[in-house]
Amino acid sequence: MKIKIRLFGTLGNKFPEHDPIKGFEVEIQEDSTVNDLINKMGISQSKIGIISINGKLVTPLKKLKKGDFVRMFQPIFGG
């Protein structure tokens, strides 16, 4: 199934097909979770701070559905 993903901060630098405004589509198996998506993309869990699906905050255990729009933000820190 296809989902759309948009990566914020430096998360998108690893993916040349990532459009910083529109994101990009990813093919993933049915019944996959956000964690499965993260693993498939090769992103370290420590690099992700906030995850949302269709505008709602979720955990990595959330199941994905066809057409979902996933946004991932790197951790926010500073002094």
Set out the residue ranges of the language-model regions.
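Ubiquitin-like/PB1-type beta-grasp interaction modules and other compact soluble beta-rich domains
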Residues: 1-78
